[in-house]
Amino acid sequence: MNNESICILLLLFVKITSYYSYYISPLKKNIYTRTIYKGHILKLKNDKPEIDNNIINYFKNIRSDYPFFQQNNSPIYFDNAATTHKPKSVIEKIKNFYYYNNSNIHRGIYKISRNATDNYEHVRNIVQKYINCDSSDEIIFTSGATYGINMVCNIIMDKIIKNENDEIYISYLEHNSNIIPWQENIRNKKKGKLKYIPLKKNGYINIKKFVEKINDNTKIVSINHVSNVLGNIQNINLIIKKIKKKNPNIIVIIDAAQSFPHLKYDIKKMKLKNEDPDILVTSGHKFCAPFGSGFVYIKKKLTHTSKTNPFLYGSNIITDVNKYRSKFVSSPYIFETGTQNISAILAMGEAIKYLQKINDEGNAYKYEMYLYDLFLFYLRSFLTNHLVELPYIPEPNTPIKPDKMRTTMQVRNSKVDDKYFHSEIQNQDNDYLKIFVHNTRKDNKKKIAILPLWSLNFTSFDLVTFLDFKNICIRSGHHCASLLHNNFFNINESSRISIMFYNTPEEVQYLAEQISATTHMLHSMRRNGKAV
């Protein structure tokens, strides 16, 4: 290591140490307690978001349901799209199973085994009632969305995809778990072809263009209801209705991993308007259930009308085993091979009951979006014109002023190619404090409280590392959505903020403050001649 490298490392160490001493040490005495941080006093503008104080107090009070938030120095947690925290009732369900009813299911005839089996099957009924589907036999328990999509992909490729011209549509917005299984099955089984759904510049599916592409060869459409990066809520009711109108034989799969914690499904109601999905995939740990839990809703017509093979082979799925051939049970049990994660499934039932209680108030989504709007309000207050809110797409024939071009992404509809985030926009000036966010909320589009942000002058790793010093948890990287970053944003990675109903107004203010402070600190380090 040469002298220059040593000097750079020493300078970086001194700056980080100074930053820690100046910003963090004093905060430990004041913030990292169970007393909610109050934030600095701001001169607030008239457009500050507001909501009924009774709603705020209700959701502040439910934090007492979560042991995670009762610990000293509880982290300020905004990575809820990665996983959610678990209420005490969910944790107690796991503990009670192992304390008092630990036994296997669908096997023993003794009392605690029968009880375990009954309780396990009762969760199937809880799920069926919560999403209001026709039968509990349409509910298959899984370890999560990744397993669920792989299982569904395997079933579909065997039953539906017959030749190399059969089309499977996904989008650039998908989680890798809804991309790679299709790629690998097509490659290994040498049938089917993968196609991509047209998108608008704001990250919503271009329904008109998509429906025009559908033909008799289109067999599968597999899309997320909500992007785990953008938070956009796709209009799946309209999408499904138009797909089925053009080709009723198409199987529509909805990845509900990000939507299920925030939005309510009513399958029977959707079915009345021909807007219901054929398959719905969820992940338990995203909606306050334990890791290793989830479920897939599959219409009976896909599993009961013709022979269906198991995804995995083994115990608990057979009716008869002969020397060279075996006979299998029907759905849903044919897809629940081996010993299941019983305690996690029981606790998932408890989590759904908890969600039902929260949703009965009718304000969870409203409150989350209030926090989202409040966060952006504070971020605008701190960063002022350094905050760039994308997408900005003017109406056709609207003149673009050069000064406005420097603070917003302004692209005429006729001049935008397949890349969303253009290099000429990225490099338009030398504003090293500039932070980009993707916020379709400002255009009155439907979304959940997820916000990606990034800078061209430091990495998401830099931002998230320094926020971690402040006891703040947000996500960095590509968030398992590689195509979205590479083919839609045209950037390598981003930071992601995701809000849940147990977050507070004080937390979102503190988060905005610290993002601004960290941005200025990183800019200062860069300005002194050393790249971060």
UniProtKB/Swiss-Prot annotation:
Species per Swiss-Prot/TrEMBL record: Plasmodium berghei (strain Anka)
Compartments in which it is found: Plastid, Apicoplast
Record key words, sorted: Apicoplast, Plastid, Pyridoxal phosphate, Signal, Transferase
Main subcellular location of this protein, as a coarse class: plastid
Entry's family note: Belongs to the class-V pyridoxal-phosphate-dependent aminotransferase family. Csd subfamily.
Segment forming the signal sequence: 1-18
Protein's UniProt keywords contain Plastid: yes
Active site: 480 (cysteine persulfide intermediate)
Keyword Lipid metabolism belongs to the record: no
Protein name per the record: Putative cysteine desulfurase PbSufS
Function: Catalyzes sulfur activation and mobilization in sulfur mobilization (SUF) pathway for iron-sulfur (Fe-S) cluster biogenesis. Active when in complex with a partner protein SufE. Required for apicoplast maintenance. Plays a role in the development of sporozoites in oocysts in mosquitoes.
